[in-house]
């Protein structure tokens, strides 16, 4: 199941374990770029790449073996340190996160696309920060 962060017209935030949210509210959720993987964008949703093609929000720390849970946790933790340091100084990652937050506030339905989900993914950190900003 996917966690969707929704912004109501009053800019309140709710989280739900639904795969798709109905109505005109904006939201952001994680999706997977692999062919046949779950979480592909549905009609009315906008895909935003957050893999390494995105030089700002992509995780620059390479996971050499996607089945190595320890290595996955390590690259996510390294991204966490870099991400929170960037947020603290209003760097480019903070600006990109705020831009996504504003898009959700205006009602856009965004699917943050990476190769990891539903396995642990750095995208969860980005979504959690957007959720915090919407509260």
PLM-predicted stretches and their roles:
Residues 2-135:
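Catalytic phosphate/metal-binding cores of nucleic-acid and nucleotide-processing enzymes, i.e., regions
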